[in-house]
Amino acid sequence: MRDSETAWLDLEDPVVNRVAERCVSLTDRPLKNCEKLQILRYGSGGFYKPHQDTFSDTEGNKRMYTIILALNDDYEGGETVFPNLRRKYKLNKGDALFFHTLDNYELMTYKALHGGLPVKSGEKWICNLWVHKYPYN
């Protein structure tokens, strides 16, 4: 499914908080609806097969938005691909990729199916922020 390394950063950290606040300003939800910031490192050959970011839980607090931030761009391959849209994106350092995971705030949308193509050389570093419908615990 995935070949990467992961770390989680607490939103209470002042620097992390500023990054998350900027990201969440793209949405109609407050910071308290966000998960911790996820940092990912994909080494050479690292990938993530196409998947959906949202899921349903017993309380219906689904992930509504995904924000991917590019921390570097000195690698080959590793594009973020949306197979159902026939699109792929190679982000530059500092770029953000923002997309809705739900259609009409309720149903999973086929448009949000995405993955990471294999890194051909170098390391790909990104961070993800997921914003939920309701406050996230």
Predicted regions and their residues:
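Fe(II)/2-oxoglutarate oxygenase catalytic core
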Residues: 1-137
